[in-house]
Amino acid sequence: MVLSPNQNQKIINPIEESPTVTQELSENIVLTTVDDLYNWAKLSSLWPLLYGTACCFIEFAALIGSRFDFDRFGLVPRSSPRQADLLITAGTITMKYTPTLVRLYEQMPEPKYVIAMGACTITGGMFSMDSPTAVRGVDKLIPVDVYIPGCPPRPEAIIDAVIKLRKKIANDSLQERGQLQQTHRYYCVKHNMKVVEPILTGQYLQTSDRKAVPKELAEAIGMPVSPALQAIPKEEVSLG
């Protein structure tokens, strides 16, 4: 098979018409907006704050490994909320965790985003059945941007949630960001708790033995006996 000179030249030099750097002004200008530039830099450098409280965090730990490699999305875990802009809640949220979680969210700088990972975080999961301590939905405390259902969700689902969050950030606007509020919540069952009287009422502190040492014990250890105890007649014990 004999190739013509033109065909041979195309095969030998396939990048003959490749773009080159020119000095023309029109070829070195990029037209964009401040929102697009800001969102492009933001979605490529998300710094998450990991708030793992249960088994869902084990699946997230697998995401950090080399098999899934979430560093390709620019995710750099931070240990301080003041350096993070993404809060990932993984696991059951209890009433005792509530003040800590809200404080961490308030310490994060704007703009900040939240990913709710797992059924326990979204609706309370199996721990919310007849439990007065489990919070049925973290969106009752802080606004949530992306939900990841599952018990627990796989690392691929977390990657999909990060991609969806990046698309949401790409459409954000600096002027409208402070006005946006969460309008929809994940469905969850409300708490139906019965109010009962407290068990620890403090009545045991008002017994006579707590107010004063018994007369027999005071005499045995050599303590001074109060006049009120001295007025009590000593009981005679019959031994036979």
Curated annotation (Swiss-Prot):
Reaction(s) this enzyme catalyzes, per UniProt: a plastoquinone + NADH + (n+1) H(+)(in) = a plastoquinol + NAD(+) + n H(+)(out); a plastoquinone + NADPH + (n+1) H(+)(in) = a plastoquinol + NADP(+) + n H(+)(out)
Residues the entry annotates as binding [4Fe-4S] cluster: C55, C56, C120, C151
Free-text remark on how the cofactor is bound: Binds 1 [4Fe-4S] cluster.
Protein's UniProt keywords contain Thylakoid: yes
UniProt cross-references to Pfam families, sorted A to Z: Oxidored_q6 (PF01058)
Superkingdom of the organism of origin: Bacteria
UniProt cross-references to PROSITE patterns, sorted A to Z: COMPLEX1_20K
Cofactor: [4Fe-4S] cluster
A GO term from the CC aspect: plasma membrane-derived thylakoid membrane
Record keywords, A-Z: 4Fe-4S, Iron, Iron-sulfur, Membrane, Metal-binding, NAD, NADP, Plastoquinone, Quinone, Thylakoid, Translocase, Transport
Topology relative to the membrane: Peripheral membrane protein
GO biological process, any: photosynthesis, light reaction
Entry EC number(s): 7.1.1.-
Chain's role: NDH-1 shuttles electrons from an unknown electron donor, via FMN and iron-sulfur (Fe-S) centers, to quinones in the respiratory and/or the photosynthetic chain. The immediate electron acceptor for the enzyme in this species is believed to be plastoquinone. Couples the redox reaction to proton translocation, and thus conserves the redox energy in a proton gradient. Cyanobacterial NDH-1 also plays a role in inorganic carbon-concentration.
PANTHER family assigned: NADH DEHYDROGENASE, NADH DEHYDROGENASE [UBIQUINONE] IRON-SULFUR PROTEIN 7, MITOCHONDRIAL
NCBIfam families: nuoB_fam (TIGR01957), PRK06411.1 (NF005012)
Protein known as: NAD(P)H-quinone oxidoreductase subunit K
